[in-house]
Amino acid sequence: FFQKQLYNQKEKNKLKKKTWNGLYVYAVDGLQLTLPKSDDIIKANYNGRKVSKYRESYMPKMFLTAALDVINGVVKDAREYPTLNEVADAIDMVKSFEDNSLTIYDRLYCCRKLILEHNNQNNYFLFRLRKSVMQEMRLIFKCKSIRKTIEVDGVTIHLIKVKNPKTNEFDYFASNLPIRLVTEKTIRSLYNQRWEVEVAFRDFTQTIRLEEWHSKKINGIRQELWTAFWLYNYCKLKILLKLPAVKNRFSDHYQKPNFKLIFNYISTNIFSFLKRKRGLSKVIEELIDRTTEKRRRHSRSYKREIKSPMSPFPYNNTVWNI
């Protein structure tokens, strides 16, 4: 029910959403959610995550892939499955994206199928490249020039390397955007917006408390999931309509209200909102005005270190799966 409500909500508010250069900008990423261990959930094939050949985590896991509108802060679409396959989920979601849209991906997603799907749908992509990317794109790793244009299965793609001035290291990207937009400054600013999907996932788990499920049946879990998305979008749209238009969307300085306070008020009075009682919108506007503050995005100034953390699935929290 709430999945349909979410899609209806998106269509209803489409004209209110803001764009960049006439493009809706989305970011796709994945999230792992812990489910309660019940017979109904196990029967629906939601099992623990594999930690070795014969062992898995005790609690069942749901693998969620979501597309977030990073300019407006709302959930565009999502897929959930018992197994981890973010690339297949992304390919499926791209089919519903607008022609005038740009989707940003991290290093996991770059593959031929996703490139061809974007080409079929006539929309744009921006991939960050990993060292083991397809052979045609590895040219940029050795090339002396900053930008290079190639073709992958008939699709024209612009490759570019962007230098981090603080670490003096290069990051590599691939995009089918018009070549006038494939510049170091633009690509860096665009990719920095991908962090908004990580912030949204933090809100899902820390503010909305998605993993504190009320139901122990998979249908109830799915209803709670899509209800959370609907409420999240409702709050973000209220904030979007109240805050003034931003001239430079990629500026380090921005204004933001207290999302947790606004979400808690709306979720506590949800039935009053559904009945459209008078005066509630004024309260939301007042909360937004009172809690909005100027903030600054801080970039990482040190070299990234990838360490080997302690396993999130200690032996005592796993079970045999033979």
Regions found by a protein language model. Give the residues of each.
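Single, function-defining residue in the core of a domain
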Residues: 1-6, 17-24, 31, 35-41, ...
